[in-house]
Amino acid sequence: AVSVLVLPASAASLNNSAIQTAITLGAMDTSQTGSLDAAVTRGAFAKMLVSFSAYRESASQQGNLGTLYKDVPGSSQWAPYVRIAVQQGWMNGYTDGTFRPDNTVTLEEACTAALKLLGYKMTDLNGVFPTAQLNKAQELGLRNQLNRSQSEAMNYEDCALLLYNTLTANTASGSAYGTSLGFTVSNGQVDTSTVMLKSLKGPFVAAEGTQLPFTPVSIYRNDKVSASAELNRYDVYYYSESLQTVWIYTRKAAGRILSLIHISEPTRRSYIS
């Protein structure tokens, strides 16, 4: 038997490829897809940056490494992501020894971090901050369809779009950034399915009392975002532990995953035959 696992779009807000990709990479979870207009904090943006980088799978393995900034203790949910973002030079703390993880991230801060993610040196840009950074981001297409102005706070949808545009943009060395992460980039679109297949496990048929080996962040049930990862008897499920995602299908026969596809219409369904 052959099956095709769909990366679902269960509502209008999820029809955007940027949102789907952010969820797939772990930059966002199902709780945030319900409030896409919520402002993104510096701590949350550090996580999003790392999720769109080569460090996305190793960040959660760092554990408690001690206090990074006086307002980011090692026990903070943002600590591993802030550590990586700062060590890689994508974000900076403040001279008073704080990171201010709860401050909202602005357009110019987010664009600057994205440019650094792409390997651009701020000293090579023409002009002064933030005009130089915003102009370079515009030139590279990072601000495509991003309706924010200087000093405006970024919400989750904005950040997902900015980082999706980063995947399709050229790095300082001239290659599409997404390809360096193993994605296929074509005509401004990013296909993450090849990466997902490497970490995908299943299909499995749930028995009475079956438990997942991890607590998923993103849950899809019958191609719709769900808040519950409860497995019922005979549910067919797939999961990616590294992406902290599970796909559950009720009353469907098991098959073998051969490919994953992205769709944008909420009425499309995956099939298993």
List each model region and its residues:
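Short nucleic-acid-contacting surface segments enriched for D/E, G, S/T with interspersed K/R
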Residues: 224-237
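Feature responds to low-complexity, polar/acidic, surface-exposed segments characteristic
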Residues: 1-18, 23-46, 50-79, 88-108, ...
